[in-house]
A protein has these predicted regions:
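Conserved catalytic cores of phosphodiester-cleaving nucleases, focusing on short active-site segments
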Residues: 76-95, 112
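Polybasic (Lys/Arg-rich)
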Residues: 1, 146-167
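Generic, well-ordered alpha-helical segments
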Residues: 68-69, 104
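Acidic-basic catalytic patches of nuclease active cores, encompassing PD-(D/E)XK
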Residues: 1-68
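Short, charge-rich binding segments
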Residues: 67-68, 78-80, 118-120
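Beta-rich catalytic cores
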Residues: 72
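Catalytic cores of nucleic-acid endonucleases
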Residues: 95-148
Length: 167
């Protein structure tokens, strides 16, 4: 079944957003980011000319610089038109949806938003959790919808549904 809303977003170049601790090398192609996060090739529909920020790399650098434990954050920040951004957490290695808890995702959301230093960019109230197609069955979609009914900003999608939001 999946999402029916296609072409909802247009990816924008992330070079103008300021992120605490970000370097130019943190801007990567979505295909590469997805592959590094464990997305299988047959489901990885994005191209490397579609750019995003690999927040894991930023968080690793911040923790080393500050001599602290690495904070939980989203894996990916995608700039979209009109100075907005989306966050996504890649869970391609996840085999069970029963492990998702609101109290685990909220700190990732807050940490990710807090390292965005650009006042002119605003969060688009969409935190996507990306899963393999075989894990996100209709039964599992219903379970997640029920579990997260109090928080509609969390959206559980497979890579095809996520890709369709942009194409």
């Amino acid at each position: 079944m999946g999402l029916t809303m296609e072409n909802k977003y247009k990816i924008d170049n992330p070079k103008n957003i300021r992120i605490e601790g970000m370097q130019d090398t943190d801007i990567k192609g979505l295909h590469t980011i997805f592959k590094n996060e464990g997305c299988i090739d047959s489901e990885n529909l994005f191209a490397d000319n579609e750019k995003a920020i690999a927040l894991d790399d930023v968080q690793t650098r911040l923790s080393k610089r500050n001599h602290t434990d690495k904070k939980a954050s989203a894996d990916i920040l995608i700039c979209i038109v009109k100075n907005k951004y989306l966050l996504a957490d890649a869970k391609f290695r996840q085999e069970n949806v029963k492990n998702f808890k609101l109290q685990d995702l909220n700190p990732k959301l807050n940490c990710s938003k807090n390292i965005v230093l650009s006042d002119e960019f605003r969060f688009d109230n969409a935190f996507y959790v990306l899963l393999k197609k075989k894990i996100l069955s209709e039964t599992n979609r219903r379970y997640l919808k029920q579990q997260f009914k109090s928080s509609p900003l969390y959206r559980f999608v497979n890579t095809e549904d996520f890709w369709n939001l942009f194409h």
